[in-house]
């Protein structure tokens, strides 16, 4: 599970309720709530390595930097690198700025031979084409609108496939937990027949 704009109390409560391991790296102080917030990775699998990636460029107006939270997870003896991501929004940054931020994540992912999952709020649909050009699969390409009129929440993968019997989609009911509709994908490593990883944001 990849979460964005969450504080320490929130991620602890969710992890405790669902009996999940987690890693959370706050990025900045929320401008109205005045609490640290940032992205988190939650998983039922053991977390063996973590890191915080500081993304380039400050958002216009707020002068805050975004970050990504990365975790290497041991899934049945195999490693998977997972990134929880929240790129700068459309009103505070250009498409080129978001591509620069994506490049920081892609460069870090290039250092591992593990399969990779990059999930979160990208504040863009077009950023998916950028990930595709970099060799990533885009299982959530067709999930539809995830906030208002926009499709901004996505999952990108390297070294993992979609099983024929499942795929990707979004949760219609959020019960007030977010203004976004979370997306999900069920993924398997090449050459396997059973689901190995279920990713959501």
Residue ranges of each PLM-predicted region?
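N-terminal, active-site-proximal structural segment of metallo-dependent hydrolase catalytic domains
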Residues: 2-17, 31-32, 99, 103, ...
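A long, amphipathic alpha-helix that forms part
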Residues: 96-114
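Aromatic- and acid-rich polysaccharide-binding/catalytic face
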Residues: 80-86
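Metal-dependent phosphoester-hydrolase catalytic domains
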Residues: 72, 109-117, 122-201
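Active-site flanking residues adjacent to catalytic metal/cofactor-binding acidic residues
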Residues: 4, 85, 119-121
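Structured beta-strand-rich core segments of catalytic domains in phosphoester-bond hydrolases
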Residues: 2-79, 167-169
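Surface-exposed cleft-lining segments at the edges of enzyme active sites
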Residues: 52-61, 86-96
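Short, glycine/acidic-enriched loop or turn micro-motifs at the edges of active sites
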Residues: 8, 89, 123-124
């Amino acid at each position: 599970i990849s979460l964005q704009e969450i504080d320490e109390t929130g991620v602890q409560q969710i992890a405790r309720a669902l009996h999940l391991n987690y890693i959370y790296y706050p990025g900045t102080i929320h401008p109205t709530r005045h609490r640290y917030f940032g992205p988190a990775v939650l998983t039922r699998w053991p977390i063996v390595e973590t890191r915080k990636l500081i993304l380039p460029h400050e958002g216009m107006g707020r002068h805050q930097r975004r970050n990504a939270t990365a975790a290497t997870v041991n899934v049945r003896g195999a490693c998977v690198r997972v990134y929880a991501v929240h790129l700068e929004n459309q009103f505070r940054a250009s498409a080129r700025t978001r591509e620069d931020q994506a490049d920081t994540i892609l460069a870090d992912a290039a250092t591992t031979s593990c399969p990779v999952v990059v999930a979160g709020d990208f504040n863009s649909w077009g950023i998916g084409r950028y990930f595709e050009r970099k060799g990533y699969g885009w299982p959530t390409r067709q999930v539809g609108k995830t906030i208002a009129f926009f499709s901004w929440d996505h999952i990108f993968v390297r070294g993992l496939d979609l099983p024929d019997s499942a795929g990707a989609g979004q949760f219609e009911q959020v019960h007030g937990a977010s203004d976004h509709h979370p997306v999900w994908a069920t993924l398997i490593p090449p050459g396997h027949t059973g689901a190995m990883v279920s990713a959501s944001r």
